[in-house]
UniProtKB/Swiss-Prot annotation:
The gene is adk. This is Adenylate kinase. AMP binds at S31, R36, E57, L58, V59, G84, F85, P86, R87, Q91, R161, R173. Belongs to the adenylate kinase family. Monomer. Keywords: ATP-binding, Cytoplasm, Kinase, Nucleotide biosynthesis, Nucleotide-binding, Transferase. Consists of three domains, a large central CORE domain and two small peripheral domains, NMPbind and LID, which undergo movements during catalysis. The LID domain closes over the site of phosphoryl transfer upon ATP binding. Assembling and dissambling the active center during each catalytic cycle provides an effective means to prevent ATP hydrolysis. GO terms for biological process: AMP salvage. It comes from Maridesulfovibrio salexigens (strain ATCC 14822 / DSM 2638 / NCIMB 8403 / VKM B-1763). Residues 30-59 are annotated as: NMP. The lineage of its organism: Bacteria, Pseudomonadati, Thermodesulfobacteriota, Desulfovibrionia, Desulfovibrionales. It catalyses: AMP + ATP = 2 ADP.
Amino acid sequence: MNILIFGPNGSGKGTQGALAKKKYDLDHIESGAIFRKHIGGGTELGMKAKEYIDKGELVPDDITIPMVLDVLQSSGENGWLLDGFPRSIVQAEKLWEALEKDGVKLDFVIEILLPREVAKNRIMGRRLCENDPNHPNNKFIDAIKPDGDKCRVCGGALSERADDQDEDAINKRHDIYYDDNTGTVAAAYFYKDLAPKAGFKYIELNGEGTIEEIKDTLMGQLV
């Protein structure tokens, strides 16, 4: 089973991706984690990517695409869930070309829908657990408010990502995501239009529901 998942920062995309990964034993390929690995390792591609990430800008395709495609080609036998890529219409087209060229079947594309202002507030309230960044903790969402400065799931220490508190950086990321001409929403639309003739299923989810509500809807459609 091979899945693409779309959703703005703050939509719970990472959480839902982790749940699907666990249920179906998929490789969860998250472009941000790939970037962080390269940045932490001090690779040439990583250092180039960091310059753009620090400014809240889209990392150029000639840096991103080689990283992502390499990981897809070495993924496990149960398939993969690709999270955070493609982020533009150009990347969407190039990814589809690569999948077709390699004979890789795409089974599902998921889009989590969330208004921009709601997404922004969720980002600024997000707290990351030292043990698992996908443990849900957000001071602005009643259902997943942390226990003081401790993770509500495991009790681990919580921290903020600096760019989660930078409104300018958030706005830049959302400018890219919500751009329905060339940005990430346009990339999602590309796959939505392609789905009927390409043979994969396109799933739209209401991101304003609770984690459990979204999960139940998603799992009911991944069949």
